[in-house]
A protein has these predicted regions:
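The feature marks the mature, well-folded catalytic cores of soluble enzymes
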Residues: 1-367
């Protein structure tokens, strides 16, 4: 079964930005954002950092005040930083299935590490190095020989005959997957015969009993073909938080309104409507808003979204965009969805300059 993100976790993975990536024009700001994420994670659970320059990254982490007793660094060549989409997707064997901490069974079934192919969101960008990270980590026995990560009992499963990105699927931990039609049915990813093929695939690999297809919703500047983690997210107690646009003149208004109506029509496995909580859509942010704007990027609108939050043990990390009212409203919605967790905001304006945000650069590994 594919666990819900709020179930107990072993650690989180970050793939660190470096000078040979598209982050180069504003690398210091990107690395500072990653340091803020790393500090927040290591207050609650261990952290795996993947980088081609381990000595430099270790120095950054130490100087940044990160608890190094919680950190494992893996040396590996990388194209970019989007761990959500190139990292392992983990399932749990049946005797550890559960939708909450209370359902977790200590000492139950093992974790299965699914290694899918990542092809740069439908061959838009180079991904040859990122696509080898999982195999390198596993072959180096990084998981097997490390007490910090504590995932020695995980089983590797080669799924590289299929293309799948972690940001394209949401699980409620009870057998339901929420996913965007546009992304999964993209011709540049998999050659499948429609939704029924995916339903069989998700049942075989993830134990999914149901797939809810989201047909509407998008963000300008998004390279992923509308990843679900930018639009709508499962939360505990049959809740979905989603992005809502309140400005009829905004280009997103109609599509997000249609998405909202579709979400209202979805039902839980028990046949009841989901509890829906609306996140605000951030005010428009453009590349030209930054003093060091890259001329080649033009004046494009960037895909800022509060739906791109990360749930970790005891906390929710969510992106902020220097918009005090919207940032605060988003925090209040997330507190409503996760009342027992600390809600921690992290300025992610630099991340959207490369068309992702906080959830996109992280991947959690469940217990």
């Amino acid at each position: 079964m594919l666990p819900a993100e709020w179930e107990p976790q072993r650690f989180v993975q970050l793939t660190w930005p470096h000078a040979d990536t598209d982050w180069a024009p504003y690398l210091d700001a990107a690395q500072e954002c990653f340091l803020n994420i790393a500090r927040a994670i290591t207050l609650h659970e261990p952290l795996l950092v993947v980088t081609p320059t381990p000595e430099d990254v270790e120095a950054q982490l130490r100087e940044g005040g990160v608890d190094m007793s919680q950190v494992v660094i893996e040396e590996c060549p990388t194209n970019d930083t989007w761990a959500r989409d190139h990292a392992f997707i983990c399932t749990r064997e049946p005797d550890k299935i559960g939708g909450s901490t209370d359902d977790y069974v200590e000492g139950g079934g093992n974790i299965i590490l699914h290694d899918f192919t990542f092809n740069g969101w439908g061959m838009k960008f180079a991904a040859n190095l990122d696509n080898q990270i999982n195999r390198t980590i596993y072959d180096d026995d990084t998981f097997a020989d490390n007490d910090i990560l504590d995932i020695w009992d995980a089983t590797y499963q080669d799924n590289r005959d299929k293309i799948l990105e972690g940001g394209s699927i949401e699980s409620d931990g009870k057998g339901t997957i929420l996913t965007p039609t546009e992304c999964l049915l993209s011709a540049n990813r998999n050659i499948f015969e429609g939704k029924s093929s995916f339903k069989r695939w998700f049942f075989d690999d993830f134990g999914a009993q149901r797939v809810l297809w989201l047909d509407d919703g998008f963000l300008l500047g998004d390279d992923t073909d509308s990843h679900i983690d930018t639009l709508a997210r499962f939360c505990p107690n049959d809740t979905i938080v989603y992005v809502k646009c309140e400005d009829p003149d905004d280009i997103h208004y109609d599509a997000l309104k249609q998405m909202e109506e579709q979400l209202k029509g979805f039902s839980t496995v028990d046949g009841k409507p989901f509890r829906l909580l609306a996140l605000p859509l951030p005010a428009p942010i453009h590349e030209s808003d930054f003093p060091d704007a890259v001329a080649s990027e033009g004046d494009q609108r960037l895909p800022a979204t509060y739906a791109n939050f990360l749930v970790i043990n005891g906390a929710v990390l969510y992106p902020t965009y220097n918009q005090p009212d919207n940032d605060q409203r988003a925090a209040e919605v997330l507190h409503d969805a996760f009342p027992d967790r600390e809600i921690i905001g992290i300025d992610c304006r630099v991340l959207i300059r490369q068309h992702g945000s906080l959830h996109c650069v992280t991947m959690q590994y469940p217990k």
